C-alpha cells in the first residue's frame, strides 16, 4: 500500500510519535472559540469541560492538522472530531449560505456505531437549523432511497466503507468537495474485512483532505491507514488521570464448564450484582442456551447478535441505556473472526493481536507489531452481516455495573475492549471472567465450548498485559459449600435446554424481531408511545418450563443471601379474608364509642306520624 501524496505529489513524511498526556489542562469549551450555536448545544447536553482528548484534538483540528488519536473507550473521541467538522461547515455556510456540498465523511466499522455517531451529530447540530444536514448510509433502505438522500448533497455522510464504495460506484455520492475524513475505531475497519473498500476509497479521496483516525489501540492496521490517508499527522496518546485509578475491578473465577451456569444462576437469582450487566458469550447458540437457562428461573434477559435485524439491535441498546433491561447476553465472536488466525498455544503469534492494556499497546509492543506486520494475512472473510455487527467496540453502553465474561475471549485485545463497556466516564465498574482449567475441559459435553481449551493460556497473557499498565486481575472465590446446594436445580434447568430447543428459540427470535423491525418501523415512528411496549426480553418458551424453579426454597438460601433477598421485618401479612361488611363493621364500632348517636333526651320522631301533606 502506498502512502498518500500531498499537493506536490510527494509522499507524506513519517512523523515521530510524540506522547501527549492530559496533564493539568484547565481548558473549557469557551476557550475553543466554537460557534455560539455549538456552545448552546453543549450547554443543553451539560458538557461543562472538555475531556483530555477533546481539549487536545479540537484546537489541532481547527488549525487544519491531521490527527491520529489513541484514547480509551468512553473518553469522548466522537465529540473530538464532530465539533471541528461542524465548526468548519458553519463557517463556510456563513460565508456562502447557498453552498451545497458533502464536506465531511465519517467511516465506522458497524451499523450500531454509525447510528450512535449520527445521534451525536444531530445533538450538536440541534441549534444550527438547516445549515447542517447529515445522512446515515447504513440504514436499511433501498438503493433508490439512498440515491434520493444523497441527491441533496448532505454536509456530513456517515457510513461503513462498503456503503460508500457502492454509492460512489453508482454516482450517487460525490466526494469532489470533501474536506474532512474520519475513520472511527480505525483498528477495526481493516479487521472487519474492508481492505478492498479502503484501498478503493484512498484513490477516490481528493488531495488535501483533513483526516482523523480515532482508535483505542494503535496497531499495524492503524499504521496502514495512516500511510494511506494522513499527511504528517499529529499523534495523540492520551492517558486519562481517571484511568490510572481503579476504574474497573477485574476478577477471575476458575470453574468447571457446567459450573459456569451454576454460578450465573446464583449471581442473578441471589442478586449478588446490582445494576446492569453485559454477559459476553462465544457464539450465537450460547446466547440462546444461556437465555433459555435463565428463563427457567424467572430471570429476564435479551440477546444481541449479528443475526438480529439492525433496527432491533439498535433498539435493544437504546432500551438498555434507558434502564428497561438489566441483562444483555451478547455474542462477541467478531473479535475472533476478524483477527488473524493463530493457535492459542503459540505465545509469539499472539503479540500482534494482543497489543492491549486498558489503554492499548505500549510503544515497545507497537514496535514489535511493526516488525510482524509483514506476515501474510490469514483473515477469514466476514459475511455482510458479520461486517455490520460489533458489540464489544464503540457502542456507547451507559451505566454498566458489570461485564461478565461467560466465555473468556481468545485474545487479550478482545478482553480489553469487552471490559471497556463498564467503568466509562470516570465511573467504577467490575469485570468478572469465568476460566475453565485445562483438567476440567471436555468433562461436561453439553456445556463444553471449544475456546475454553486454551483459557489458562489466554488468562496468563491477559494478566501480563494488564499488569504492565498497573491493573490487577484478582482471583474470586465463591463459597462452593453454599453454592452446591443449588446444583440440583441448575441440573434440572440445564437438562431442559436441548439442542433442538436452542434452534427453535433462535428461529423464533429472528421471526419475532423481523416483524418488529420491518413491518412496524414506520408505525412506531408515528406512534412513539406504543414503541415503549415493544420488549425484547420476553420468554421464548421453546424449552420445557418448570415453574418450581422460579422460586428459591427458604432452606436453600444462605443466611447472607436470605437477608439480601427479603427484609426480616415485613410486618403483618394477613392470609385470611374477612367475610364481614367492612363499612357496617366500622359504623358499629363508632356507635360503640358514642359516635353517631343522637343526644340523650331528644324525643324520637316517627316519620309516618309527622308526615304533612302539602297544600294544593
UniProtKB/Swiss-Prot annotation:
Residue ranges of domain Helicase ATP-binding in the record: 58-236
GO molecular function, one term: DNA helicase activity
Chain span(s) of sequence motif DEAD box: 184-187
SMART domains: DEXDc, HELICc
Top-level enzyme category: hydrolase
Residues making up the signal peptide according to the UniProt record: none
Keyword Translocase among record annotations: no
SUPFAM superfamilies noted in UniProt: P-loop containing nucleoside triphosphate hydrolases
Entry's family note: Belongs to the DEAD box helicase family. DDX56/DBP9 subfamily.
Name listed for the protein in its UniProt record: ATP-dependent RNA helicase dbp9
Source organism: Aspergillus niger (strain ATCC MYA-4892 / CBS 513.88 / FGSC A1513)
Amino acid at each position: 500500500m502506498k502512502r498518500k501524496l500531498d499537493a506536490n505529489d510527494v509522499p507524506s513524511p513519517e512523523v515521530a510519535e510524540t506522547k501527549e498526556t492530559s496533564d493539568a489542562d484547565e481548558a473549557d469549551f469557551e476557550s475553543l472559540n466554537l460557534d455560539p450555536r455549538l456552545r448552546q448545544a453543549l450547554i443543553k447536553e451539560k458538557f461543562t469541560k472538555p475531556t483530555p482528548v477533546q481539549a487536545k484534538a479540537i484546537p489541532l483540528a481547527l488549525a487544519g492538522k491531521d490527527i491520529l488519536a489513541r484514547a480509551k473507550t468512553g473518553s469522548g473521541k466522537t465529540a473530538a472530531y464532530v465539533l471541528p467538522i461542524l465548526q468548519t461547515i458553519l463557517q463556510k455556510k456563513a460565508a456562502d449560505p447557498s453552498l451545497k456540498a458533502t464536506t465531511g465523511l465519517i467511516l465506522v466499522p458497524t451499523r450500531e456505531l454509525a447510528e450512535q455517531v449520527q445521534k451525536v451529530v444531530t445533538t450538536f447540530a440541534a441549534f444550527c437549523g438547516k445549515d447542517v444536514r447529515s445522512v446515515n448510509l447504513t440504514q436499511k433502505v433501498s438503493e433508490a432511497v439512498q440515491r434520493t438522500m444523497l441527491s441533496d448533497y448532505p454536509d456530513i455522510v456517515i457510513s461503513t466503507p462498503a456503503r460508500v464504495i457502492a454509492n460512489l460506484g453508482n454516482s450517487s455520492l460525490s466526494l469532489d468537495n470533501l474536506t474532512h475524513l474520519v475513520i472511527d475505531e480505525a483498528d477495526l475497519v481493516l479487521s472487519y474485512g474492508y481492505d478492498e473498500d479502503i484501498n478503493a476509497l484512498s484513490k477516490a479521496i481528493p488531495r488535501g483532505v483533513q483526516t482523523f483516525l480515532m482508535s483505542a489501540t494503535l496497531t499495524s492496521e492503524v499504521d496502514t491507514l495512516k500511510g494511506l490517508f494522513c499527511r504528517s499527522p499529529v499523534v495523540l496518546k492520551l492517558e486519562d488521570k481517571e484511568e490510572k485509578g481503579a476504574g474497573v475491578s477485574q476478577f477471575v473465577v476458575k470453574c468447571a464448564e457446567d459450573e459456569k451456569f451454576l454460578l450465573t444462576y446464583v449471581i442473578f437469582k441471589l442478586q449478588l450484582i446490582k445494576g446492569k450487566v453485559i454477559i459476553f458469550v462465544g457464539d450465537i447458540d450460547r446466547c440462546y442456551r444461556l437465555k433459555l437457562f435463565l428463563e427457567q428461573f424467572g430471570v429476564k434477559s435479551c440477546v444481541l447478535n449479528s443475526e438480529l435485524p439492525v433496527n432491533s439491535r439498535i433498539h435493544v441498546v437504546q432500551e438498555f441505556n434507558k434502564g428497561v433491561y438489566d441483562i444483555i447476553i451478547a455474542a462477541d465472536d467478531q473479535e475472533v473472526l476478524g483477527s488473524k488466525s493463530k493457535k492459542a498455544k503459540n505465545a509469539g503469534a499472539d503479540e500482534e493481536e494482543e497489543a492491549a492494556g486498558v489503554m492499548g499497546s505500549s510503544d515497545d509492543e507497537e514496535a514489535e507489531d511493526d516488525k510482524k506486520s509483514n506476515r501474510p494475512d490469514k483473515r477469514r472473510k466476514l459475511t455482510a452481516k458479520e461486517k455490520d455487527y460489533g458489540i464489544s467496540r464503540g457502542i456507547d453502553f451507559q451505566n454498566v455495573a458489570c461485564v461478565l465474561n461467560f466465555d473468556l475471549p481468545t485474545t487479550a485485545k478482545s478482553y480489553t475492549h469487552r471490559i471497556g463497556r463498564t467503568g466509562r466516564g470516570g465511573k467504577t465498574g467490575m469485570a468478572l471472567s469465568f476460566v475453565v482449567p485445562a483438567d476440567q475441559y471436555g468433562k461436561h459435553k453439553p456445556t463444553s465450548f471449544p475456546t475454553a481449551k486454551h483459557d489458562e493460556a489466554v488468562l496468563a497473557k491477559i494478566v501480563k498485559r494488564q499488569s504492565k499498565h498497573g491493573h490487577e486481575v484478582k482471583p474470586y472465590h465463591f463459597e462452593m459449600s453454599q453454592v452446591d446446594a443449588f446444583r440440583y436445580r441448575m441440573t434440572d434447568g440445564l437438562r431442559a435446554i436441548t439442542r433442538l430447543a436452542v434452534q427453535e428459540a433462535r428461529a423464533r427470535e429472528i421471526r419475532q424481531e423481523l416483524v418488529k423491525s420491518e413491518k412496524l418501523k414506520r408505525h412506531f415512528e408515528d406512534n412513539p408511545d406504543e414503541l415503549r411496549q415493544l420488549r425484547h426480553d420476553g420468554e421464548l418458551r421453546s424449552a420445557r418450563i418448570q415453574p418450581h424453579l422460579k422460586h428459591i426454597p427458604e432452606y436453600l438460601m444462605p443466611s447472607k443471601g436470605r437477608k439480601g433477598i427479603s427484609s426480616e421485618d415485613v410486618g403483618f401479612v394477613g392470609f385470611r379474608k374477612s367475610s364481614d361488611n367492612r363499612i357496617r363493621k366500622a359504623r358499629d364500632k363508632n356507635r360503640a364509642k358514642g359516635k353517631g348517636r343522637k343526644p340523650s333526651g331528644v324525643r324520637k320522631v316517627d316519620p309516618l306520624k309527622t308526615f304533612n301533606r302539602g297544600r294544593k
